[in-house]
Amino acid sequence: DKEAVDWWIRRCQEWKEKYPVVLPKHYEAGDDEPANVYAAIKEISKRVEEDQITVVGNGSACVVGGHAYEMKKGQRFISNSAIASMGYDLPAAIGAWVADHTKDIILVTGDGSIQMNLQELQTIVHHHMGIKIFLINNGGYHSIRQTQKTHFHEPLVGIGVDSHDLSFPSMEKLAW
C-alpha cells in the first residue's frame, strides 16, 4: 500500500535527521591525524557520479564508509562488512570493473588491507582498468591496533609502525 510505504519513508527520514550516524565531532581532525577520514569519505562520495560503483575494504574504510558515504541514485556500495576478510576489496574492485567497465570503479581501502593483494595493482595496470584507489594510510593494521589498545594496552604487537615489529611498504612510492 503506497500510503503506508510513504509514511514509513517519512518516518525513517525523521529518525535520520533526529539521530544522525555522523556527528559534527566526527569531522574534527585529531592532533595525531594528517587528515580526517570522515571528511575524506564524505568528499569522495560527493564527487562520485550517479550509477557508479564504490568498493570499500575493512576497518576504517568499511566503518567510516558505511557512516559518511552519501549515496546517489543508482550507485552501488560494495563491502564485506562483518566478514572482515582483509584483502577482499582490491579483487572485488577488479571484479566490479570486469562486470561493468562503463564507468570507473572507486576503491577505498586501508594500507593493511591492500597489502593482502598488493600484486593485483599490476593486473589493474596491465589491463588498463579504470579503478581509482583512495588509500587510508593509518600506519598499519588500525582495527587490530584499536583492539589491542582497548583490551590489552601495551605492548602493541604486529600492527605496524607503532609496534616496531612490522613494516609496510611506502604507499607514496607505490602510488602512480
Predicted regions and their residues:
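Thiamine diphosphate
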Residues: 1-2, 64, 69-176
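Terminal amphipathic helices with adjacent charged low-complexity linkers/tails
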Residues: 1-10
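A residue-identity detector for tryptophan
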Residues: 7-8, 15, 97, 176
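Active-site diphosphate/adenylate-binding microenvironment
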Residues: 13-96
